[in-house]
Swiss-Prot record:
Disulfide bonds: none annotated. It is a lipid-anchor. It holds the Pfam family Ras. Residues 28-43 have a biased composition (Gly residues). SUPFAM superfamilies: P-loop containing nucleoside triphosphate hydrolases. A lipid is attached at residue 253 (S-palmitoyl cysteine). InterPro entries: P-loop_NTPase (IPR027417), Small_GTP-bd (IPR005225), Small_GTPase (IPR001806), Small_GTPase_Rho (IPR003578). This is Rho-related GTP-binding protein RhoU. The keyword Heme does not apply. It comes from the Eukaryota. GO terms for cellular component: cell projection; focal adhesion; Golgi membrane; plasma membrane; podosome. There is a cross-link at residues 174, 245 (Glycyl lysine isopeptide (Lys-Gly) (interchain with G-Cter in ubiquitin)). It comes from Bos taurus (Bovine). The lineage of its organism: Eukaryota, Metazoa, Chordata, Craniata, Vertebrata.
Length: 255
């Protein structure tokens, strides 16, 4: 299937909303993808994507906007929630599991249960929440690396639509604060060795699809690398580079 508007093959055209997948609200425990082993099981490839970050930075809004094309009208703190869909990547089915976690301190002991078999982390902070950005390196990276030393991380700046919001800027100014500069966020991504840094908005859906496209590709690469025989490890980088280009172009539909 040819690339669609909003695909990485079309730089600067990431505003298009994704095609909504089927959604299954998880009813099992925080770490349960529906069975044993990695997400997807033996019948097909699977990617388990875990969203982490401070409370109220918009993690749930990202998931809801991506999976339903809707937007939550009120803030309800998340405990733990699972969403899943089957996506077509390079002509093969991939089960995408999204684990939305609670950022509040009272869930610090429970939250790591969601990290089991994680293929990719979306580490979220609000671009208009300096304290949430500070916690990226002070709290979240150490927590992730304690439980998943090698899993890739994508740093995500949420609520980008509020960067120029006058009311938000006034409130920040009262506290002698400013929005997080994009340059500072990119530098942070380099320091924590994140796969990439992407700013997005769940409300306008700008760069929203790009965030989850990147998560799927990075998650598949990581999952494959964990299963690669050691003897073929030296050939992995070139092979994955070729495949990732194909996936970026062809990942554009849900089934």
């Amino acid at each position: 299937m040819p690339p669609q508007q909003g695909d990485p093959a079309f730089p600067g055209r990431c505003e298009a909303p994704p095609v909504p997948p089927r959604r299954e609200r998880g009813v099992r425990g925080p770490g349960a993808p529906g069975g044993r082993g990695r997400a997807g099981g033996p019948e097909g490839h699977g990617v388990k994507c875990v969203l982490v970050g401070d409370g109220a930075v918009g993690k749930t809004s990202l998931v809801v906007s991506y999976t339903t094309n809707g937007y939550p009208t009120e803030y309800i703190p998340t405990a733990f929630d699972n969403f899943s869909a089957v996506v077509s990547v390079d002509g093969r089915p991939v089960k995408l599991q999204l684990c939305d976690t609670a950022g509040q301190d009272e869930f610090d002991k429970l939250r790591p249960l969601c990290y089991t078999n994680a293929d990719i982390f979306l580490l979220c902070f609000s671009v208009v929440g300096p304290s949430s950005f500070q916690n990226v390196s002070e709290k979240w990276v150490p927590e992730i690396r304690c439980h998943c030393p090698k899993a890739p991380i994508i740093l995500v700046g949420t609520q980008s639509d509020l960067r120029e919001d006058v009311k938000v800027l006034i409130e920040l100014d009262k506290c002698k604060e400013k929005p997080v500069p994009e340059e500072a966020a990119r530098l942070c991504a380099e320091e924590i060795k994140a796969t990439s840094y992407i700013e997005c908005s769940a409300l306008t859906q700008k760069n929203l699809k790009e965030v989850f496209d990147a998560a799927i590709v990075a998650g598949i690469q990581y999952s494959d690398s964990q299963q690669q025989p050691k003897k073929s490890k030296s050939r992995t980088p070139d092979k994955m580079k070729t495949l990732s280009k194909s996936w970026w172009k062809k990942y554009c539909c849900f089934v």
